[in-house]
């Protein structure tokens, strides 16, 4: 199911806001045990993915189709936002959020490159079959 850029912007912005609010509401519970701090990092990684999607959709609406997110400032800004939100819960959440976000970013980049990257034909130099210098 494919939605338009504007709809995707609205959905990802709403999900980012709800995820951030949920992380803040349940911050005491998320910081209570080891497994829940890992879950807090996973939620922070989800916040990273949704905020990156919203940010890139906004850029596509403003600058036109085909605009791609770069490491600086888009990815770095969204990563810092997610790490800050995870840091408000627990220090371990920051570490797990960073790890989960990097894994998620790797797979997002891998999927994006297979779908949207244009493959250029490989040019091989032609073999010259003419008279060259004679060797004595």
Curated annotation (Swiss-Prot):
This is Dolichyl-diphosphooligosaccharide--protein glycosyltransferase subunit KCP2. Residues 24-34, 109-136 are cytoplasmic. The chain crosses the membrane at residues 6-23, 35-55, 76-108. It comes from the Eukaryota. The keyword Transmembrane helix applies. Its main location: endoplasmic reticulum. A motif (Prevents secretion from ER) lies at residues 133-136. It comes from Mus musculus (Mouse). The modification Phosphothreonine is found at residue 124. It is found in: Endoplasmic reticulum membrane. Subunit of STT3A-containing oligosaccharyl transferase (OST-A) complex that catalyzes the initial transfer of a defined glycan (Glc(3)Man(9)GlcNAc(2) in eukaryotes) from the lipid carrier dolichol-pyrophosphate to an asparagine residue within an Asn-X-Ser/Thr consensus motif in nascent polypeptide chains, the first step in protein N-glycosylation. N-glycosylation occurs cotranslationally and the complex associates with the Sec61 complex at the channel-forming translocon complex that mediates protein translocation across the endoplasmic reticulum (ER). One of its GO terms (molecular function) is protein-macromolecule adaptor activity. Residues 1-5, 56-75 are lumenal. Belongs to the KRTCAP2 family. It holds the Pfam family Keratin_assoc. Component of STT3A-containing oligosaccharyl transferase (OST-A) complex. STT3A-containing complex assembly occurs through the formation of 3 subcomplexes. Subcomplex 1 contains RPN1 and TMEM258, subcomplex 2 contains the STT3A-specific subunits STT3A, DC2/OSTC, and KCP2 as well as the core subunit OST4, and subcomplex 3 contains RPN2, DAD1, and OST48. The OST-A complex can form stable complexes with the Sec61 complex or with both the Sec61 and TRAP complexes. Interacts with PSEN1 and NCSTN; indicative for an association with the gamma-secretase complex. InterPro entries: KRTCAP2. GO terms for biological process: protein N-linked glycosylation via asparagine. GO terms for cellular component: oligosaccharyltransferase complex. It is a multi-pass membrane protein. Keywords: Endoplasmic reticulum, Membrane, Phosphoprotein, Transmembrane, Transmembrane helix. PANTHER family: KERATINOCYTE-ASSOCIATED PROTEIN 2.
């Amino acid at each position: 199911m494919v939605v338009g850029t504007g709809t995707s912007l609205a959905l990802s912005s709403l999900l980012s806001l709800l995820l951030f609010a949920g992380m803040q509401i349940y911050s005491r519970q998320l910081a209570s045990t080891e497994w829940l701090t890992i879950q807090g990092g996973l939620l922070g990684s989800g916040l990273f993915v949704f905020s990156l999607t919203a940010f890139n959709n906004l850029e596509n609406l403003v600058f036109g189709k085909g605009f791609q997110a770069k490491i600086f400032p888009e990815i770095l800004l969204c990563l810092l936002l997610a790490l800050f939100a995870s840091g408000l819960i627990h220090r371990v959440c920051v570490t797990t959020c960073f790890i989960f976000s990097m894994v998620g970013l790797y797979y997002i980049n891998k999927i994006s490159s297979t779908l949207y990257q244009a493959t250029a034909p490989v040019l091989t130099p032609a073999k010259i079959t003419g008279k060259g210098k004679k060797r004595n």
